[in-house]
Structure formats: C-alpha cells, structure tokens
Regions:
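ABC ATPase C-loop
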Residues: 155-156
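Conserved structural motif at the start of ABC-family nucleotide-binding domains
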Residues: 9, 24-26
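The feature captures the beta-strand-to-loop junction immediately N-terminal to the Walker
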Residues: 40-42
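Conserved ABC transporter NBD signature motif
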Residues: 63-73, 82, 116-121
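Helical segment within the ABC ATPase nucleotide-binding domain
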Residues: 178-191
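Helix-to-loop junction immediately C-terminal to a conserved catalytic motif
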Residues: 55
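Conserved ABC ATPase signature
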Residues: 138-142
C-alpha cells in the first residue's frame, strides 16, 4: 500500500466493552485499500466487537474511526450508503422467506427496483451461481453453507467497496468455505474491494487473505503476511 493512500477503514485509540467489562482499549487498526485482511483470535479476543464497532452496531468508548481517511461516527445506515457491507456471524437470513424474497427485500431496502434491481441480482448470481439451485427454497430449509452464501450474496447486492465478514466459516466444511470464498476473492481482485475477514479457522482463511492480524485479549499482537505468521511457532500454537 502506498504511504500516501489512506486505509479503506481504520481506527485509532479505540475502546469498547460490555456492561463495564473492557473488551479492548487504545486499539489501533487499519484495513488497507484493495486488500483482504484476516483478523484471527480465540473467542473473547474482541474480533466481533471490533467489527460491530467499525460498522456502528456497537458504541466505542474512546478513539476515532476513519473511512477512507475521513473522520466519522459510524452508523449502519450511513456506512451502507458509503459502500460498506456487513455480514454478521450467524448468517442472519429470514428462515420463513424464500431466497428470492430475501434478495428482493434487500433491494427494496436499498431503494433499488426495476431494471437496476434485476441487474444487481444477476451480478450476484454470476459471482455465486450455486444460489440459483435454491433460489425458490425457504432459507430455513437450507444448509449452513447455503445460508452463508445467501447472506454474503445479499451483502454483495449493494456493490460494496468494503466488506466486513464475521466468521463466515462457522459450521462449514473446508471445501464449502473455499467454494464460498473463492468467487468472492476473485471479485475482490477484479474490483479492488477491501475485505475484513474475522476468523478462528486460521488455515482456511489464510488461503484467501493478503494480510493477517492476530488479536488476543483485546490487543493486536501480530500483523503481517500469512507466511510470516506461519514462521512464528508460538503464535501458531494459539490455533
């Protein structure tokens, strides 16, 4: 990344917690433009809280957040308008709706209709063509991998420049995870999208990441390319 290029998304001196319990403090973070950064760590390290704070779903008690170098106070609606999409842990699909309706609802929420809505839908189905196989099925009848694909596809409808993914591999076999991430990685490289991927499944996530950061007890203890982390036996023993 060029020294003159502002990160896609960054935080400086961030603090956040729950019910008086501090999750992280004085935390600095930067997602480079056009890269996939994988943030790894055990449960309770603060990864998901950071993701929620960056998208405006959890308040920060200290520090500042910048989007493409511009200071802002994140709110989900504003972040979405600025091209940031968030896929939460747990998939968040509506079990009673068929997949087509889930997409239609997302398009309606984004005030997209007619030819533009059809165009966006086709774009996503070209990236994730397996969704066509269960397009008319209720989300509650789908497997975990299929639900995750729907959740990611719904996020891609907005053509985000920044994508935040919270543990997309949960409950997925390694091949299913790779089937999900490979086309997303290809799209990211083609469009220059920036992706922050939060994971515990280190090996699978490294295969689709440009950089990796390790979070432990609310602190960043490593950041570099995946091969560099592989050389740190003590850090790898954490996983």
């Amino acid at each position: 990344m060029s020294g003159s290029t502002a990160p896609a998304l960054s935080g400086k001196g961030l603090g956040a917690g729950y019910g008086g319990r501090e999750v992280f403090s004085q935390f600095d973070f930067a997602l480079p433009q056009g890269e996939v950064l994988c943030l790894v760590g055990h449960n309770g390290a603060g990864k998901s809280t950071l993701l929620k704070a960056l998208f405006g779903l959890h308040p920060v008690s200290a520090g500042e957040i910048r989007l493409r170098g511009q200071l802002l106070k994140p709110r989900p609606e504003a972040m979405a308008r600025e091209g940031v999409a968030y896929v939460p842990e747990g998939r968040g699909v509506f079990p009673g709706l068929v997949v087509r309706e889930i997409f239609q609802l997302a398009l309606w929420s984004a005030k997209l209709d007619g030819a533009e809505a059809e165009k966006r839908t086709e774009e996503v189905l070209e990236v994730l063509p397996r969704i066509r196989e269960f397009w008319t099925r209720r989300a509650g009848t789908l497997s975990g991998g299929q639900q995750q694909m729907v959740s990611v596809g719904r996020a891609l409808l907005s053509r985000p420049s920044i994508l935040l993914l919270d543990e997309p591999s949960i409950g997925l076999a390694p091949k299913t995870f790779q089937d999900l991430m490979a086309p997303i990685r290809a799209l990211q490289q083609r469009l220059g999208m920036s992706i922050l991927l939060v994971e515990q499944n280190v090996g699978e996530a490294f295969a689709v990441s440009d950089r990796v950061a390790v979070m432990k007890s609310g602190r960043m203890i490593f950041e570099g390319v995946p091969d560099d982390l592989s050389d740190h036996a003590k850090l790898m023993d954490m996983f």
